[in-house]
Amino acid sequence: EVIYSMMRELNPKKQYRYYEDYDKERFLKEVYFEEKDYDELRSLILRRKNVILQGAPGVGKTYIAKRMVYSILGRKDEEKILSVQFHELYSNDEFMEGYRPDDIGIYKYKRGCFKRICNKARNDPSNKYFVIIDEINRGNITKIFGEAFSLIEIDKRGKDNYIELACSRERFYVPENVYIIGTMNTFDEKLAIKDYALRRRFCFYTINPAFENEDFKKFYSQNPLLSKVVSAVVNVNKDLSDDLKIGHSYFCKPMDDEDIKMTVKYSIEPLV
């Protein structure tokens, strides 16, 4: 069964699907983000391969990560994207490989999601593959990656740097065409990443609130109450550290006055 599973991953049946086009222009229409920041972040991801988007709650880190990947791929191709969220109980078994119970409680060997996408990328070297890890700082990152942790480094990529995994005894390496983007809130100091080994393997890019973005100004200026609330939030942010600032994404969707009041009362006020 293990052999058949490997063969299916390395030699998948070709499926022809339509993927919606997505480029830089569309990104900048959908995301309140400056063009120079887009160019900088895109270049950082492609050059360094491992990037963590950090920032206060509500700045749109996950939203930005997903759409940045779309724009790099040139289309909304979910087949080349792994999205996962880390948490305290997330394990190496789920991420890399291990024995897990099936529907009737029998433990069977299963490949984890990261190992599967690495196998896909290895079999398709002309295309880029992306791993988006939401709340990356909420999991025990070194344990989740396990033996593969060192292999995500730029100079440790490729088949020449393979390791033998303890569980399956299979040879494993992280292909050159796999890119890892993590997101993390800087709001909770208890979850701050202080592990030097981790910081050495990732670049950290800070996402700031976009209240000064011209497109966002045009959006909120259409509603007098929203304009008043945004102005108040901007003033509050001046007295807050970068880690505690209130993000703009609370106000990005169309809202009537009642929605705005509820957002302020139940989402914004608890933060301050």
Q: Which residue stretches match the model-derived regions?
A:
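Extended, composition-driven regions rather than compact fold-specific motifs
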Residues: 251-255
